[in-house]
């Protein structure tokens, strides 16, 4: 029997596909929702590049640049508390603490003023990045998808339903209890409402989309055997450890 996540996914399929026998099981990536038995079925993961001024500066970029976007596959999600295998083809895996916005109502060309009505809730996240692969791709002016969109590269905590989060909420990242990143949500160059407005001008957002809203300054490496914990005031943490 199909579980609730798969039933919800099937309900969103085109009518002609609903009774189709597929060669493989339909993927059903999802995230836990605080206080609910239902889970948040994930459709897509969008990420915002350079959305904190100090982080842009530490990589030599102009913090006034408009927001730009890239994707991670939905099945890159891993829940908080997971022990991960260290990723292949990298010697410089970096943490990036991020606020995650969960979209509950879709739309295209959403205005900043109406953006909150499209939000389901918020979560803590970690946009894991193979920094050496990213640097190499950038130096050759090639796409850097494989530095971001790899297996188990999106650690996401439990989603807390809500329409807004305080700009004074702190966002922090610790590696083995050493504080690496420490900022406030209000330090974003482009606030959540403007991120949603900009992204929805490129693509129609849909229920189930997640938006990782950028990381503050202080990104750095996480080695084999180390643990990494991201905290945002008022939200459950997103924590993982790389096995030895």
Question: Each predicted region: which residue ranges?
Answer:
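N-terminal amphipathic/basic-hydrophobic helices that include classical n-h-c signal peptides
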Residues: 1-19
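Extended, compositionally biased flexible segments
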Residues: 17-120
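Catalytic-pocket segment enriched in acidic/His residues
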Residues: 17-39, 55, 61-63, 123, ...
